């Protein structure tokens, strides 16, 4: 058999020097340490849950799901986002430390899906609330597509310059004309109107009750006679 020789490592220079930049070092350290905050509201999230199994094994990408937004640098939105849940989603995003990323997963998250045509309570795109880095279309997207989206996000992180990212972010994000919140006066004050609970009987009810008693008295008088 032919012997295979591997090149020997150069061990003659113990004082080796690695030349890099702070941006490259930071990007390299964040490539395999993305900690996602899972924000699943619909059936698309079931496809992401399949990545936890041994077939796809998302641990090889360094993904460690976190339950606190203060410990996460990636939020993955999957499913329909309603107007009532929109402030909570924005609050979770604001609590995440910089740099932070967003993956919009599924048609309902990206455009509102089938609920966006005639629903008054559906946000027509999560990018109206928070900036999105990677769009992942599908209804629902397959686990292979999710892995591809994570790979694309890692490539984006590897070529990223931190100062450019901060400058490119939109500071004042607002809703569209159809998605404006209006502060209304609460109708649940805790004080109940006694007049609504105990209403006085109307005149017609009194007359009908009196007539019924009069007829019953006549019938009993006839039976006695």
Swiss-Prot record:
Cofactor list: [4Fe-4S] cluster
UniProt keyword NADP present: yes
Residues reported in the UniProt entry to bind [4Fe-4S] cluster: 43-44, 108, 139
Gene Ontology terms: biological process: aerobic respiration; electron transport coupled proton transport; photosynthesis, light reaction
GO molecular function: 4 iron, 4 sulfur cluster binding; iron ion binding; NADH dehydrogenase (ubiquinone) activity; quinone binding
Enzyme nomenclature, EC number: 7.1.1.-
Binding note for cofactor: Binds 1 [4Fe-4S] cluster.
NADP in keyword set: yes
Major location category of this protein: plastid
Quaternary structure note: NDH is composed of at least 16 different subunits, 5 of which are encoded in the nucleus.
Described function: NDH shuttles electrons from NAD(P)H:plastoquinone, via FMN and iron-sulfur (Fe-S) centers, to quinones in the photosynthetic chain and possibly in a chloroplast respiratory chain. The immediate electron acceptor for the enzyme in this species is believed to be plastoquinone. Couples the redox reaction to proton translocation, and thus conserves the redox energy in a proton gradient.
Family: Belongs to the complex I 20 kDa subunit family.
PANTHER family given in the database record: NADH DEHYDROGENASE (PTHR11995), NADH DEHYDROGENASE [UBIQUINONE] IRON-SULFUR PROTEIN 7, MITOCHONDRIAL (PTHR11995:SF14)
Protein name per Swiss-Prot or TrEMBL: NAD(P)H-quinone oxidoreductase subunit K, chloroplastic
Gene source species: Amborella trichopoda
Gene, per the UniProt record: ndhK
């Amino acid at each position: 058999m032919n012997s295979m020789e591997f090149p020997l490592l150069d061990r003659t220079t113990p004082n080796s020097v690695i030349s890099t930049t702070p941006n490259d070092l930071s990007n390299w350290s964040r490539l395999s340490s993305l900690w996602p905050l899972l924000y699943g509201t619909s059936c698309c999230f079931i496809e992401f849950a399949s990545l936890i199994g041994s077939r796809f094994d998302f641990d090889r990408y360094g993904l460690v799901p976190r339950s606190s937004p203060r410990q996460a640098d990636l939020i993955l939105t999957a499913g329909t986002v309603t107007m009532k849940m929109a402030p909570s989603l924005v609050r979770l995003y604001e609590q995440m430390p910089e740099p932070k990323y967003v993956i919009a997963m599924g048609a309902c998250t990206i455009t509102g899906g089938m609920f966006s045509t005639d629903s008054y309570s559906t946000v027509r795109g999560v990018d109206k609330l928070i900036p999105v880095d990677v769009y992942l279309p599908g209804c629902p997207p397959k686990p292979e597509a999710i892995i591809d989206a994570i790979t694309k996000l890692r490539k984006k992180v590897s070529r990223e310059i931190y100062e450019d990212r901060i400058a490119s972010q939109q500071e004042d994000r607002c809703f569209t004309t159809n998605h404006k919140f209006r502060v209304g006066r609460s109708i649940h004050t805790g004080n109940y109107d006694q007049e609504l609970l105990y209403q006085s009987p109307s005149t017609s009810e009194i007359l009908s009750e009196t007539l019924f008693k009069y007829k019953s008295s006549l019938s009993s008088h006839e039976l006695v006679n």
